[in-house]
């Protein structure tokens, strides 16, 4: 996926101008795996300035793995510690994050980050899921309300304006828009977060919202593949089953056929059991589900080579009732996701230890890790100060 020049420039600006290293020596953390992310330890790390394809050769195995993690942070100190000590690829601004992190601390954390630019992500859909409402002018309308009351162009303009406010704060990734197709009541798990029950309407309005974010220099992430709209429940509370794959192809999956072609864009895979596709595994941990997304074979879509994110692996019972965070992270990477997402930092040392063990044991191929690192590097764009 080609990373647009404008988005790369904005990413560099957010990270400020810091020195880069062109050396080929792999980087690594000098902290022990048992160190707490809450205790910052200054670990100088050279910036990696190669083209994306050359980045894996510059990183230690642990730093490669760290680039595949995005974790929720409580506050600036928590973010500083996990970035400095463990060089994680990204942080998530969640419902529990102290928003004073945007008072200047975030810019310092980004400037002093790891070998690649730090991804700063958020769930900012508008409506009832609006993490930044106090900073960007309120919640804004829900997706359903937008589709009922605005034109496609108006939705693009709204998303661009909100995206610009997010970009000024330092946000680089928004886990939006919701691409689920549903007519479920507003207050259900997806409900009014969806643009509607007609796949064509969802495609048009979600596409406009995603383009508005791109216009602002924020990466949109489509969710929740392969479709939560007709799921049996709420994956926050337990396992969720969708209709069979054959039913999803003509409905829930329709928007992805178009929207995955509109790069740059990411896709979040949901914790959804899909008869005829995933067996008893949720899609987020299923090789078959990620392969469906990657190849497009089976639902009439083109191949997708952009970044694939898991849904939250720590705070949703569809996963946490079955696996600890370390095992869930390993399984989502084994399935082919590029980026494992969860909402706390305390598990990071144990996760990295487990992933390194999996590399040594051949449970997780280094070739797959390298491919994901290249996708992550492409998504982030060039390091600031690297002369590009």
UniProtKB/Swiss-Prot annotation:
The GO molecular function terms of this record are:
beta-N-acetylhexosaminidase activity
Q: What pathway is this protein said to act in by its record?
A: Cell wall biogenesis; peptidoglycan recycling
Residues binding substrate: 123, 131, 193, 223-224
Catalytic activity as recorded in UniProt? Hydrolysis of terminal non-reducing N-acetyl-D-hexosamine residues in N-acetyl-beta-D-hexosaminides
> What membrane topology does the annotation report for this chain?
Lipid-anchor
Cellular compartments annotated: Cell inner membrane
Q: Where is the lipid attached (N-palmitoyl cysteine)?
A: 20
Please report any disulfide bonds recorded for this protein chain, giving both cysteine positions.
none
Question: What is the deletion mutant like?
Answer: Deletion mutant is devoid of beta-N-acetylglucosaminidase activity and shows increased antibiotic and lysozyme resistance. Mutant is unable to grow on soluble peptidoglycan as a sole carbon source.
Q: What does the UniProt record say this protein does?
A: Plays a role in peptidoglycan recycling by cleaving the terminal beta-1,4-linked N-acetylglucosamine (GlcNAc) from peptidoglycan fragments. Acts as a regulator for GlcNAc-MurNAc levels by cleaving disaccharides and allowing the breakdown of MurNAc.
- Name the record gives this protein: Beta-hexosaminidase LpqI
């Amino acid at each position: 996926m080609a990373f647009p020049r404008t988005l790369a420039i904005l990413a560099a600006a957010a990270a400020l101008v810091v020195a880069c290293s062109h050396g080929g020596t792999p980087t690594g953390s000098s902290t022990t795996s048992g160190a707490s992310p809450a205790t910052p330890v200054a670990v100088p790390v050279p910036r990696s300035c190669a083209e994306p394809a050359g980045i894996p050769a510059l990183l230690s195995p642990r730093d490669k793995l760290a680039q595949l993690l995005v974790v929720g942070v409580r506050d600036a100190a928590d973010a500083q510690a996990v970035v400095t000590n463990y060089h994680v690829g990204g942080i998530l601004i969640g419902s529990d994050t102290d928003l004073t992190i945007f008072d200047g601390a975030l810019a310092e954390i980004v400037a002093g980050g790891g070998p690649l630019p730090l991804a700063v992500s958020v769930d900012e859909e508008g409506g009832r899921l609006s993490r930044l409402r106090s900073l960007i002018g309120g919640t804004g309308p829900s997706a359903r309300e937008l589709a009922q009351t605005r034109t496609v162009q108006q939705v693009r303009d709204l998303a661009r304006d909100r995206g610009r406010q997010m970009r000024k704060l330092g946000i680089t990734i928004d886990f939006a828009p919701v691409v689920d197709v549903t007519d479920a009541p507003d207050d259900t798990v997806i409900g009014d977060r969806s643009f509607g029950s007609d796949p064509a309407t969802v495609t048009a309005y979600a596409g406009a919202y995603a383009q508005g974010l791109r216009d602002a220099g924020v990466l949109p992430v489509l969710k929740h593949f392969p479709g939560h709209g007709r799921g049996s429940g709420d994956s926050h509370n337990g396992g969720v089953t969708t209709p069979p794959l054959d039913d999803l192809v003509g409905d829930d999956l329709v928007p992805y056929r178009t929207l995955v072609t509109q790069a740059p864009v990411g896709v979040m895979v949901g914790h959804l059991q899909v008869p005829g596709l995933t067996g008893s595994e949720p899609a987020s941990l299923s090789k078959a589900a990620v392969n469906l997304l990657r190849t497009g074979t089976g639902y009439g879509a083109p191949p997708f080579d952009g970044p694939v994110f898991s849904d939250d692996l720590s705070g949703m019972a569809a996963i946490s009732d079955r696996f600890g965070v370390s095992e869930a992270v390993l399984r989502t990477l084994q399935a082919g996701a590029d980026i494992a997402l969860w909402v706390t930092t305390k598990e990071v040392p144990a996760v990295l230890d487990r992933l390194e063990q999996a590399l040594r044991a051949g449970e997780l191929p280094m070739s797959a890790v390298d491919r994901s690192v290249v996708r992550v590097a492409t998504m982030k764009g060039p390091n600031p100060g690297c002369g590009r």
